[in-house]
Structures are given as structure tokens and as C-alpha cells.
Amino acid sequence: MKAGSIALVTAGLVGGLALALSVSGLLGSGTLAAQDAAELARVAGGETERVVPGNAGQVNLSFAPVARAVQPAVVNIFTARVMRQRQQMGAFFSMFESQPRVENSLGSGVIVDGAGLVITNNHVVQGADQILVALADRREYPAKLVFAEPRLDLALLKIDPQGSALPVARLGDSDRAQVGDLVLAIGNPFGVGQTVTQGIVSATARTGIGVSDAQFFIQTDAAINQGNSGGALAALSGEVIGINSAILTGGRDGGSIGLGFAIPSNMVKIFLRGASTGKFVTAWVGVEGEPLTAESAKAAGLDRPTGMLVTAVSAGSPADQAGLKAGDIVYAIDGKEVLDPGALRYRIASQPVGESVTVTIVRRGSAQNLKMNLTAPPENPPRQLTQIPSGSILAGVSIANLSPALAQELGAGLPERGVVVVNVPREAPAARTRFPRPGDIVESVNGQRVASVADVRTALGAAQGQTLFRLNRNGQRVECLYQAPAQFGCRAVA
């Protein structure tokens, strides 16, 4: 990495992060539709007014009470992983068993339940053979992993306090944080011991960080370094509003440059609900959409391209039952601004299944609020996971019918219907050509539209030496031509 370059690193074994989630209130706009939408959103959201320090005495107030309230519930996490090395020195030396190598790493965590439940990042404990949790008061307990969700980069540990009382952190409402709010990042950077750093919420609803799937992150300038992963980002109320997860670094040292990111506490709450049932499920909307352009925003009466343009609504979905229609612009959820499809996914994912939300929309230049009841995504059609047999460039590749449930499992942004590539084994012929890739949607084979696993198998069976595939790869159309026995090429198409 060149000095001064910016690279994303995960915090924990590699790096740390702290951040407070903050969601800014909707801004007033110049056009009537935008003003109406913003007002409806404000009523639904109920923001709390912030005040700046009014005098020197207030400026000099200490953060010590906040630190004392949160620090006891923030723990250090030490992990060990046994790595066995392959013997490469011939038959004679293979008689001697290779010595295992132990890889140690460290991170942080937050106690969220007096029974001994500790939340941390998945990357802190993934693959660990031994986990040790050390409290701020020097008590130490072995821990076991009881639940993990790699898509969120969250994991839940369990320790046995053996009848002793444990300090417990309070999880706050991360949606109430705002840019400029003061926050504290608490963790174990570089293993030096528990450390508190102070900063502000630098940005809210930050997406595209690349650490976990379908998420918003809270950005903060509080100093975060290696070992902070899984630690707390605390508001001045003494509540935890984020879990440290990642940092952006410059140069080779991997240290903090004031760009840290945390998983919002509201998403942590949904994760904990999933842990209690053994399965992480987020609410389903049943819409497809695209970001607003300046042109479409102007046509809708908005003076800026904020919102998601609805392009399709699934029949019988929560969106359909709420009255959403193609062409509507989703402006806010419960008063919280929706910038794009990713923002909508987060706003819905951070709400419990079974709850209802207020959706602020703009329809034909007029703003209105709709009530939407959230349900779990259905497994319809059945996924019919299938491995393609030999005799095709796709031999060994696993495909499945997409459904709302499978789309949620596989990751953000996938459509809720069609045929998706689930797995490409390393030994499969397709792996050598990097075609297809997991997550690709197969739209047609030799010009024949395919809507199910059965359609794909039929089309492949009819192919004679030359096969043209049309794919949807992360929203980009791609055509790939395979000519037996070994000619292959792909190109992007409009």
C-alpha cells in the first residue's frame, strides 16, 4: 500500500472502529411537494432539539460520568486459533507430526445482558478455537460463540459469571443521533488496555464501506485503532449507539485518520432478536427501485434527488398492501430520510418483523403518508437448489430460484425473482474463467429467457457447442459467450 493511500481495514485483529449512528432530519425544500414531504416526515420522526454549550463552564464539563457509566460493560476479547502447517519435506519427515502454530488476536466487546451475553464483531472471533473475555475490573471468563451473522459482521458470545453480577450496557436508539453529536469510543486499541477517545458523529447513513452487507454505518472522528473492533460508541446519555467495526486508514501503519465506522445499535437489537430465535431475519418490503436522478426529482416536484423511485411492487407484499405503486418516490421511513435503495433497505431492516412504519411518499407531485405493516420474507417460489451436471460450462455450479427469503439471505440488492448463482466450486470449469460468479442472475441462455432452475437446465440441454449467457451482475447487464471446447469471453451491455 502506498503511503497516504486510503484503504479499508476491519478493526479487531487488523483494525478498530468507533462511530455513532446518526440520522439527520429531513431538510426543508423549495418546492411544494418537497416541503409537504419534509413536513410529513418530521411529524412521523419526532426529532429532539440539540443545543450547543452556552458558556465556558458548560464547555469545560467532563465526559467522566459517561465513561464511568459505559466502561465497565466494555470488555477485552482475546482469541486463539490453532493453525496446522502442511508437511512439505518428503516421506521421511512426514513421520514426524508437524507442530501446530497458534495465531492470537484481540478485539473488544460489550456486555448486553446480565446473564453473560457479549456482543462483538464477527471478524474478531471467526474461526477462533479459544475465546477469553476480560472485564475492566480484571475478571476473566472463557467464552463460547452462540450466534453469528457474517452479513452484519456481528457475533454473540456467552460467558458464565458464576453467580457474580455483571455490568450491562444500555443500547440506545441510534436513529436519534445527529451529525455533530458528541460521542465516546471505548475499546482496547493495540491491546494496551481499555481506552476512551472522544469525537463527534461525522456522518450518518454512510454506505458502501464494504465491511458488512446491506448496512448503514455511523461515521466518527473519535480515534479508533487496531483492537477497537466490537467496542462501544457511546452517546452522552450513557447509552451505546454503535458497535465499532471498521476504519479507513492512510499510509502503511494502519492507524486512525479520523474515519471510523460503527454498526448502529438499532441493527444490533434486530441481531439480538435473531439470536434469541436462532435465525436472523429482517423485515420484507416487496419493492424494487432505483436512486432518483435530478431529472426524475424535478418531474416529481422535488428540488433535489433525494428518495427512491419505485420501479416494481410485488403482488401481496407489505408495500402492495400499503398502497405503494410503481412511479412513487419513497421519501422517508418514520420521518428518517431515504436517500436511495440502500437507505430503504436499512430503514426497514432495523425495524422488527411484525411492526408497522410510516412511509412518506411523493406521488404525482403530492406528498402523503402510508402505513406499512412489516412481515418476514416468504420462501416463494421454493429455492430448488440445483447443481448443474457435467457436459456444460456451468458443470458443478449451484443455482437456485430466487425468492424474497433467499434474496435476503444472499445479500443486499438482489431482485426477488429469477435464477441466481449460489456457488461456484473451486474445481468447477467455470471457476477458471470467473464465470459465473455467486450472486449473478441468469436472465437468458442463447436468447431464451429463463425464470426458473428448470428453464436453465432445459436451455443448457438444448445448447450445441456455443452458449450465450445474459446476466445481471450487481445491476449491470453482462453477456458471456462460451464456444466449446475452451473459448470464452464477456462484455458489458446496455
Where is each model-derived feature located?
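C-terminal accessory/binding modules appended to enzymatic or scaffolding proteins
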Residues: 395-429, 436-438, 442
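C-terminal soluble interaction/assembly domains
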Residues: 422-427, 431-474, 483-486
